Regions:
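Rossmann-like NAD(P)(H) cofactor-binding subdomain of soluble oxidoreductases
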Residues: 51-56, 60, 68-133
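Rossmann-fold dinucleotide-binding core
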Residues: 97-175
């Protein structure tokens, strides 16, 4: 499989497309705003005028868009991916969406004779460029095997988890961890600073224990300094938090901590922090604790 399409060129989608181009795949890409296509075009990718055109020129189309509504928009309709099927097309959706929505979208694709996989990932643009994403995949196992070379190019670990929707559930559980880690780290730093303790000492102690995380080692010092390399915005994480709480409601389960965190992130966005990195939730805590 050499002809791969990418629909959606946000920070992650663009990085995935660049990785594939640089690895020798024939990439056709689409984005609503053309400014985001310039670098890819210079690197050798073909730029399509519609998702349909991407599908017409691809064996596999990877979707990387914001939410389920955006997935449906690029997938179905006159200029959607489904209408570009030239036979044996596979669609792989990297977007973070509700598992039940994912299953419904898979059925719509199946009705059009197209196999669809869920392939949400962990890791940002820099990780994607290096081919070091962690991928959770679900859907038809045969279709997954056909795409394995592509997936192994963008991810250093790929987990096949079963039927459609399962990978989406695991992705939501992973983003729940991210949410709580960022908030707990922010509250810990805020507490020690207000206690006249150097937060760097707090981090040194934390990172000397079993409780250290990649976030506490790689992002926490930037949180103290208020200097962020934005790879995943606070507003995007809030969108995923709402998807988590919605999925929990559908399953009939109570997740009290993420429900409270949703309120905190909503307030942070209302205070103007939505466009900074998700670890910038600490800026909201700084503001309310002056």
């Amino acid at each position: 499989m050499k002809r791969v399409g990418v629909v959606g060129l946000g920070m992650l989608g663009n990085a995935v497309a660049l990785r594939l181009v640089d690895s020798g795949f024939e990439v056709t890409a689409y984005n609503r705003t053309k400014e985001k296509t310039f670098e890819l075009k210079e690197r050798g990718a073909a730029i399509a005028e519609s998702p349909r055109e991407v599908a017409e020129n691809s064996e596999l189309v990877i979707i990387v868009v914001r939410d389920a509504d955006a997935v449906k928009q690029v997938s179905f309709g006159n200029e959607g991916i489904a209408n570009g099927n030239q036979g044996k097309l596979i669609v792989a959706d990297m977007s973070t969406i509700d598992p039940s929505e994912s299953k419904n979208i898979s059925k719509q694709f199946s009705d059009s004779g197209i196999a669809k996989l869920d392939i949400p990932v962990m890791g940002g643009p820099n990780v994607a460029i290096a081919g070091d994403l962690v991928m959770m995949a679900s859907g038809n196992k045969g279709s997954f095997e056909k795409c394995k070379e592509v997936f192994d190019t963008i991810a250093n670990k790929v987990f096949f988890l079963g039927e459609s929707g399962v990978a989406n559930s695991v992705k939501l559980a992973m983003n729940l961890q991210i949410t709580m880690l960022a908030l707990a780290l922010s509250e810990g730093i805020t507490l020690v600073k207000k206690s006249d303790v150097d937060p760097r000492i707090f981090l040194e102690i934390l990172n000397s224990t079993y409780f250290k995380t990649g976030m506490s080692e790689k992002k926490a010092y930037k949180m103290i300094d208020g200097k962020y390399d934005t790879t995943f915005t606070l507003s995007n994480l809030k969108k995923d938090i709402s998807t988590i709480t919605g999925a929990a409601k559908s399953l009939g389960i109570e997740l009290p901590m993420i429900s409270k965190a949703e309120e905190v992130y909503e307030n942070a966005i209302s205070e103007g922090f939505g466009d900074i990195d998700y670890t910038g939730i600490i800026e909201y805590l700084k503001k309310i604790n002056k």
